[in-house]
Regions:
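Short secondary-structure junctions
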Residues: 27-36
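Catalytic "initiation/cleavage/transfer" segments centered on a nucleophilic residue
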Residues: 1-11, 16-25, 85-140
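Flexible, charged surface loops at secondary-structure boundaries
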Residues: 4-7, 30, 65-66
């Protein structure tokens, strides 16, 4: 296994409601780092029928939706590794809280993706969520 020591300040990750504590926002705020959290993404449609899973998908009116989740844009005070971010989030929210963390190349694009207003999300005709439902932590 090769360790990745690439450092960055801007990251994004996904959290699922069933894998986080009820006071998850307070737990994240206690980290003291600037974050923006998307509205709950509960209308992300799975358009490719090959990816449908009748046992785990949310199905409404015959349409299949991805499991509800939040996107988090995380800004570190100094450059850190993805693994250090993962450890910090797991300490705050529990070991099952986060599985995938990405380094963000464009804060603006990632921020727009929180509500599916990024160019890519618009091109894919994704459901648009309300900007007023974005949660800002620690002076984001």
């Amino acid at each position: 296994m090769t360790a990745n020591y690439t450092k960055a300040r801007y990251f994004s990750f996904i959290i699922y409601p069933e894998s986080i504590p009820t006071d998850w926002r307070v737990c994240l705020e206690k980290l003291g780092l600037a974050m923006a959290i998307s509205p709950l993404h509960d209308r992300d449609e799975k358009r490719d029928s090959k990816t449908w899973d009748d046992n785990n998908d949310l199905i409404v009116n015959g349409k299949h939706y991805k499991k509800p989740h939040y996107h988090v844009l995380y800004i570190a005070k100094n450059p850190v590794t993805t693994e250090s971010v993962r450890k910090k989030i797991k300490r705050a929210l529990g070991v099952k809280a986060v599985s995938h963390i990405e380094i963000v190349d464009s804060v603006e694009n990632t921020f727009k993706y929180l509500t599916h207003e990024s160019k890519d999300a618009v091109a894919k005709n994704k459901h648009v969520y309300a900007k007023t439902d974005i949660v800002y932590l620690n002076d984001f």
